[in-house]
Amino acid sequence: MLKQSEAIVLRTYPMREADLLVTLFTRAEGKIKGVAKAAKKSRRRFGGALEPLTHVRVYYEDRERQELTRLDSCDVLASPMSAEVDYPRALALGHVAEVIDDLLPDREPNDAVFRLSLAVLGQLVPGAVWMPLTYFDLWMVRLAGFLPDLMHCVVCGEELDDRAFFHPLVDGLVCANDKRLASTELTVESRAIADLMFRAPLENFAGAPWPRQRCADLRRFLVQILERHLEKKLVTVTMLDKLD
């Protein structure tokens, strides 16, 4: 029996001569893996619907005693290919896919992450990737339950004033008195923006100038949290760090 769901294509891998192994983040069932038979040959059933980060309606069938779903067809609802995909945007799109794929377990629906992902994909336009990336990482850390207290020192418990610091070996922010050597400062501006992002939709921040340097410290702090919990380095972060 065919099921259907909205979904975001995360990754595709060649499988045999004409098939594709596809990882999808579905709204109904969370992350699933399936086989698109003859996807390299059949333009009618799949066309460009299996490009990473495409928003689709997928039709699929779970088969008894088989781990992989059979993908029947996909209808494109929105495609990242509808706008220019320059190198920074390609990396940003890849980062969204990598974090979702690495962080979320299989077969656990998460509507909050699904809605966040669609909102971020809609704002990841050429020349304006840093604001939606900041918003995405911030909310993914929060929705995963990893976000520490941003108002108090994790060591002494005192309220943080105008200076706060983070360190790879400390799970949270610390005050100036308790910071370790080689700590990085999280500025007052970045903490204030994080607070605003928790209280306002992504669209409220669109259109304002957002150079790479803005909230770079916040993104570094969030990536540090993600990588600690994933126990691995995020490949796309290394590549984003190399952008001019």
Swiss-Prot record:
It comes from the Bacteria. The keyword Cytoplasm does not apply. Keywords: DNA damage, DNA recombination, DNA repair. GO terms for cellular component: bacterial nucleoid. GO terms for biological process: DNA recombination; double-strand break repair. It holds the Pfam family RecO_C. The keyword DNA damage applies. NCBIfam families: reco. Involved in DNA repair and RecF pathway recombination. Belongs to the RecO family. This is DNA repair protein RecO. The gene is recO.
